[in-house]
A protein has these predicted regions:
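Alpha-helical bundle segments that constitute or directly flank the non-heme di-iron/ferroxidase center
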Residues: 1-29, 91-115
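Alpha-helical scaffold segments that form or flank carboxylate-/histidine-based iron centers
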Residues: 3-11, 32-50, 89-96, 118-131
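Amphipathic alpha-helices that form helix-helix packing interfaces
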Residues: 11, 18, 25, 48, ...
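Short, flexible helix-adjacent loops and helix caps
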Residues: 23, 27-34, 57, 61, ...
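Carboxylate-rich helix-loop segments that flank metal/cofactor sites and access channels
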Residues: 54-104
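Preference for long, well-ordered alpha-helical segments
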Residues: 92, 99-143
């Protein structure tokens, strides 16, 4: 059960940071197709976050979010990077590919380290991994 809780916390944290990053990038996106892709990714991350949150609550876990300073620092860095670039669409895509890649690595490490999990937790973890892979493929078109 402890492995399941750790996995769900990791999923929740990854999707919270994903939502935060997209929220920071969305106002900077000038390309309508990029805006649409970002909104779609945000919606999927939010759905996965809500499911992880629900499963944690079912297990009686007290929840806390990502450190607000970490989120603010990430948001500020993202905005500065985008604004300093001549091609904002490509820069946003690059940052999202990097973020999704970090998320995928963490997801795969967690899956290997934690072994067999409750089917609901395992399914949600796989869903996050597949989402991150799909997000990378989608962002490649904007590079």
């Amino acid at each position: 059960m402890q492995n399941e809780i750790e996995m769900l916390r990791s999923i929740r944290q990854s999707t919270e940071m994903g939502c935060s990053g997209i929220r920071a990038a969305l106002p900077e996106a000038q390309n309508p197709a990029m805006q649409s892709a970002l909104r779609s990714q945000w919606k999927e991350y939010d759905s996965i976050y809500a499911e992880a949150d629900r499963l944690l609550r079912e297990r009686g876990v007290r929840l806390s979010g990502v450190n607000p300073l970490a989120k603010y620092g990430s948001m500020l860095t993202a905005k500065l990077r985008v604004r300093s670039s001549r091609n904002t669409t490509a820069r946003i895509a690059e940052m999202l590919v990097q973020g999704n890649t970090r998320g995928m690595v963490k997801s795969m490490q967690n899956l290997r380290a934690m072994g067999v999990l409750d089917p609901k937790v395992s399914s949600l973890s796989t869903r996050l991994l597949q989402t991150e892979q799909a997000n990378i493929e989608e962002m490649k078109h904007f590079l």
